[in-house]
């Protein structure tokens, strides 16, 4: 893994910082694990914008990543590490002893040729997946399930991890990167280690066009719009003279947005601001 700062041969190259990983596979991805991915432009079936700042971008295939890790007690060998345009983390193509291939999230420290395994009695080793009741307290894990059998939902992006800090009865207590502490059923499965490609946060795209390649459109300030487009719009000068709100009139500075009160009882401590 190397961090490369481009020479200022043009305005678009001046600030570019790239993350170069010579271990990544340079060929095509594994075709049986690809799926089509259509562009929506942020519109729904009525043609109305439901998600702003989306449009254009390079064509992509979706990689079918195994978040469930439900192929139990069958060892697998890492064939190669690959780039995935759909996420910040890299992925690993693994070959199981029975001949099946799957993509998994590539944890930090996983290399080509390493052996991994999923199962109740899998050894405590980077890349192995097992229920959290069998993982020692204090361990660092990623791709953590919230419901048994549903597949990993927490700590899946580059450099992400969760720490197991306690185990009581049927639950384990996790400390998330945000500072939140929450209880999860001990039967839920997690993968040992942290997600790789942690240098992803250090990259600098360097120009607006690099975001357009990724299908991200510009974010326009509300105060630069007309009154018909935003509550902050219109008027002379740049002062909109009211409390900041979203385009739909909801307060935007510090207002709580969480609605799922059903699971509040599992949150031991709220995330830090």
From Swiss-Prot:
UniProt xrefs under InterPro entries: NA-bd_OB-fold, Rib_uL2_dom2, Ribosomal_uL2, Ribosomal_uL2_bac/org-type, Ribosomal_uL2_C, Ribosomal_uL2_CS, Ribosomal_uL2_dom3, Ribosomal_uL2_RNA-bd_dom
Superkingdom, taxonomy of origin: Bacteria
SUPFAM superfamilies: Nucleic acid-binding proteins (SSF50249), Translation proteins SH3-like domain (SSF50104)
Chain's role: One of the primary rRNA binding proteins. Required for association of the 30S and 50S subunits to form the 70S ribosome, for tRNA binding and peptide bond formation. It has been suggested to have peptidyltransferase activity; this is somewhat controversial. Makes several contacts with the 16S rRNA in the 70S ribosome.
GO cellular component: large ribosomal subunit
Alphabetical list of NCBIfam families matching this protein: rplB_bact
Protein name per the record: Large ribosomal subunit protein uL2
Assigned keywords, A-Z: Ribonucleoprotein, Ribosomal protein, RNA-binding, rRNA-binding
GN (gene name): rplB
């Amino acid at each position: 893994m190397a961090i490369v700062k481009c020479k200022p041969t043009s305005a678009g190259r001046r600030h570019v910082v790239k993350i170069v990983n010579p271990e990544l596979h340079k060929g095509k991805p594994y075709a049986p694990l690809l799926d089509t991915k259509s562009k929506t432009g942020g519109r729904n079936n009525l043609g109305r914008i439901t998600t702003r700042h989306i449009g254009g971008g390079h064509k992509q295939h979706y990689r079918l990543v195994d978040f469930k890790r439900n192929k139990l007690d069958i060892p697998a060998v890492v064939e190669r590490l690959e780039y995935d345009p759909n996420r910040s983390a890299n992925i690993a193509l693994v070959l199981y002893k029975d001949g099946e291939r799957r993509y998994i999230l590539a944890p930090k420290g996983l290399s080509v040729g390493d052996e991994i395994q999923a199962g109740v009695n899998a050894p405590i080793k980077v890349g192995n997946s097992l229920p959290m009741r069998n993982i020692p307290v204090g361990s660092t894990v990623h791709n953590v399930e919230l419901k048994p059998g549903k597949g990993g939902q927490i700590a899946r992006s580059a450099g992400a991890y969760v720490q197991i800090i306690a185990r009581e009865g049927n639950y384990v207590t996790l400390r998330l990167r945000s500072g939140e502490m929450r209880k999860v059923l001990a039967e839920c499965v997690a993968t040992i280690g942290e997600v790789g490609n942690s240098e992803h946060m250090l990259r600098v795209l360097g120009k607006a066009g690099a975001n357009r390649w990724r299908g991200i459109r510009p974010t326009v300030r509300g105060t630069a719009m007309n009154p018909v487009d935003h509550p902050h719009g219109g008027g002379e000068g740049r002062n909109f003279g009211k409390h900041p709100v979203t385009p739909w009139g909801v307060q935007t500075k510090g207002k709580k947005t969480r609605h799922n009160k059903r699971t509040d009882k599992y949150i031991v401590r709220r995330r830090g601001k």
